Amino acid sequence: MKSAKSQVNQDQQGENQRALSPLQSTLSSAASPSQAYETYIDNGLICLKHKIRNIEKKKLKLEDYKDRLKNGEQLNPDQLEAVEKYEEVLHNLEFAKELQKTFSALSQDLLKAQKKAQRREHMLKLETEKKKLRTMLQIQYVLQNLTQEHVQKDFKGGLNGAMYLPSKELDYLIKFSKLTCPERNESLSVEDQMEQSSLYFWDLLEGSEKTVVGTTYKHVKDLLSKLLHSGYFESVPVLRNSKEKAEEVLMQSEMKKQLLKSESIKESESLTELVQPEIQPQEFLNRRYMTEVKFSRKQENVEQSWEADYARKPSLLKCWNTLPEPDGQEKKKESLESWKSSLKTQEVSKPVVSLVQGKLRPTLQEEQKQQVPITPVSQWKPESPKSKVGSPQEEQNVQETPKPWVVQSQKEQDPKKLPPGSWAVSVQSEQSGSRSWTTPVCREQASVQPGTPVSWENNAENQKHSLVPQSQISLKSWGAASAGLLPNGQVLTRKLNVEPKDVPKPLPQPIDSSSALPKDPVLRKEKLQDLMSQIQGTYNFMQESVLDFDKPSSAIPSSQPPSACPVSTVSAEQNLSNQSDFLQEPSQASSPVTCSSNACLVTTDQASSGSETEFTTSETPEMVVSPCKPKPASALASPNPPLSKSFQLPPASGSSEAISTAPFQAMQTVFNVNAPLPPRKEQEMKEPPYSSGYNQNFTSSSTQTVSQCQLPAVHIDQTTQPPETGAGYHPDGTVQVSNGSLAFYPAPTSMFPRPAQPFISSRGTLRGCSHGGRLLMSSYQSPGGYKGFDSYRGLPSVSSGNYSQLQLQAREYSGTAYSQRDNFQQCYKRSGTSSGLQANSRAGWSDSSQVSSPERDSETFNSGDSGLGDSRSMTPVDVPVTSPAAAILPVHIYPLPQQMRVAFSAARTSNLAPGTLDQPIVFDLLLNNLGETFDLQLGRFNCPVNGTYVFIFHMLKLAVNVPLYVNLMKNEEVLVSAYANDGAPDHETASNHAVLQLLQGDQIWLRLHRGAIYGSSWKYSTFSGYLLYQD
């Protein structure tokens, strides 16, 4: 054992390059002496515990030797010598156990005593701090009071219990108070000013000999201590004048309040005495408002005050109509009828109580007949709505709707206006095909008095504001969710119904021309442009689809006359702005059909045959027909039902024939355009998200098809599209694509335009099929059968020798750099053309569709054979993603990321013999660190990505009689361990390895639980790891 200890000492002396031992570093980093002492005691107890365990193991080995001797076995001389020391080992074991108990008890007592001392010291320090703060506050209070004149007089004359101070010393204190309690200096910040004051207070508390205000801080401190002990500042006298003034102000305010209360009580009592005998038989009087009524006996002109109070307080009851009259029963009946009508409409007005009430009654009744009662929208009764329709024919059509309006025929309601929230939509009959939709106007009022309640101004304001947010109001309106309805009660200053203008169309459709715009085409165009500039911006468009296939109205044209909602100019202009935001200038000239949330706007290309629709000319009205979409029942916010459940679509201008679209009657198409894409130039300027080195080819060739974005309709007009495909347009109708010498030939016109069967003029047959005007071809074929991305594409060649290539806008993808060998790239095709490698292959994306996706749903990927290889197979991209009765779904193609290269190997070139347990193993030599994932200073591997990793470690034990324990740790968890000990002071290796599934951010490191590690320039102790598979 002595030799072993000497060897350990020699080894430790050889490690002079270490500045501090781990124990010394822990002691130096301790926050307090008690923590350092506690750490030192704990480490000593741990070492003693391990020593006891080793002695117990030696005792067990010696007992085994003794048993073997008893059994007659022969032992070697070393074993016999060890058996002779059995008693000594027992003695050492008992001594070590007793020593452990003693040290444990002593350490506990010492720690308790030290904690008590620390607590006492902390309390004393806290008390001194509190005392300093208390003294500073007392000094500040004294100095603040010394600034008052009456306090200075008391100290100069020694009055009111104040001690006598010479004027010189008093001047010192006054000057010092101005320094420590200064007025706010705007040139300095509050922090700087308070810092200066704190310096004065600090020097005062210290009592230094520094000069201040003509004396020293020590002298000022003595003067202040005398003032504090004098007792004058225990109760500083306050000036009597200020007290009396404050009391007088309080008394005057209290007297005013009492007088106001008494006057209000007297007035309320006099009013109750006057009003109570007249309206005592009426039980409906609301007595809550009696205290708010102000009545004057000297008031003679009651009519003027009644008009003012009527406009100000319309919520009181009409009590003058129900007072008993001796004239006859007719007035009673009229008053009762007026009372009932006021209860129905819940209109209340102020009661008029005066001595000359009988004289005012005829005037009030006449004004009541002339004035128009107001019915709030929130007070409607669902069972008896009071809206009206304009004509008997329209009334009959309205009654044919599922939930007809109830029309009342009471005479007393004729001169009344409809409430501002009531909307009436006229329904057009089948005979009036070319007549425009009209909104019926209510009957004219007999007269409008100047005393009309103020709430009609709100109605006018609502009518003014109803022109701008029509697209929002249309979703919550009371009728059939229209954006262009006008209230029936509005008094129009011009003619409401504009005469319709016929437009030369094959199938004329009813177009709503009721508009608030001027009739002059120039003024109308300017108004439209102004409104379009107001609503221009970024929008989110989504067309709601009717997902219920069982509704007959959504699949079968209704036999009833179609009820379309009148659309205002704002909705049409919003559709125009929607179209400008929605169409992203496709490179192929096509006729897009744009679907927005309010209406379906159909436009045609300039190449289309037939007449075209222009929105700003005087020959066509400024409205575009917008079909009303029925909302789900759960989405309706009002009890009023929609007026129609059938749909009617406007025909596309320039249509050559009308086709009854029976196959499209059950088609449901959902468009969800989240946001318009930025221009192509911005996307090309953006840095590609993948590393550069491989390229990706996408070519898109699309025949012109009608985008199937309409909801179930009655008629759809199909336009004949010219086969234009950008730069690859040929006058003979042939469309050639630079995709392995591929040519398209136009098919004859049919019900659904589709391209003809394509033909391949070179090697390789075409895979896939064409649906919806898109040809999907596989480009994922290598000679070995592996499906990967094409890093290059050969020059397209046609059998006739002609060359044609589509010039399409594209996004460029630069690939990952791979080292090429023998003209071969990993996971890619061999080069089979003489053209070599194209550096910048572009990705062409089709812009013929207007559906949306996180990138762009219209960017359908088309792949084609490069002309290399005879055997082609269908890839997942080649599967057609469209069907004749469904929308085109997006296919997103992203390049596969390259697996990261992660590997490291570290070693130790010096011994590691810490004095404490569970220390991290830090390495001083880095053999390899691929990926920069191993931290040499901490000895930790940081997991960069999720995946499966392999770790191997070998640790050579220092030649001491101490076993070696090494743990492989993941964060703070022990994964695997290694052990080395043969019972002799010699070098042994502790090694192990593990295959682990790690997550990004995990840390792998080695921990030396116990023992010492041997290190040399031959690097016996190493730690390595690498990434096996990436998730």
Curated annotation (Swiss-Prot):
Ca(2+) 1 binds at D982. Keywords: Calcium, Cell membrane, Cytoplasm, Differentiation, Growth regulation, Membrane, Metal-binding, Phosphoprotein, Protein synthesis inhibitor, RNA-binding. It comes from the Eukaryota. Specifically expressed in brain (at protein level). Residues 425-439, 446-458, 830-853 have a biased composition (Polar residues). The keyword Membrane applies. GO terms for molecular function: metal ion binding; RNA binding. GO terms for biological process: cell differentiation; negative regulation of cell growth; negative regulation of translation; positive regulation of dendrite morphogenesis; positive regulation of dendritic spine morphogenesis. It is found in: Cytoplasm; Cell membrane. Residues 897-1031 form the C1q domain. Residues 1-27, 364-458, 500-520, 605-658, 830-876 are annotated as: Disordered. The keyword Oxidoreductase does not apply. Coiled coil: none annotated. Ca(2+) 2 binds at E988. It is a peripheral membrane protein. GO terms for cellular component: centrosome; cytoplasm; cytosol; mitochondrion; nucleoplasm; plasma membrane. Residues 608-646 have a biased composition (Low complexity). SUPFAM superfamilies: TNF-like (SSF49842). The modification Phosphoserine is found at S852, S853. Pfam families: C1q (PF00386), Caprin-1_C (PF12287), Caprin-1_dimer (PF18293). The C1q domain is essential for the function in Wnt signaling. Promotes phosphorylation of the Wnt coreceptor LRP6, leading to increased activity of the canonical Wnt signaling pathway. Facilitates constitutive LRP6 phosphorylation by CDK14/CCNY during G2/M stage of the cell cycle, which may potentiate cells for Wnt signaling. May regulate the transport and translation of mRNAs, modulating for instance the expression of proteins involved in synaptic plasticity in neurons. Involved in regulation of growth as erythroblasts shift from a highly proliferative state towards their terminal phase of differentiation. May be involved in apoptosis. Belongs to the caprin family. Homotrimer; via C1q domain. Found in a complex with LRP6, CCNY and CDK14 during G2/M stage; CAPRIN2 functions as a scaffold for the complex by binding to CCNY via its N terminus and to CDK14 via its C terminus. Interacts with LRP5. Interacts with LRP6. This is Caprin-2. The gene is Caprin2.
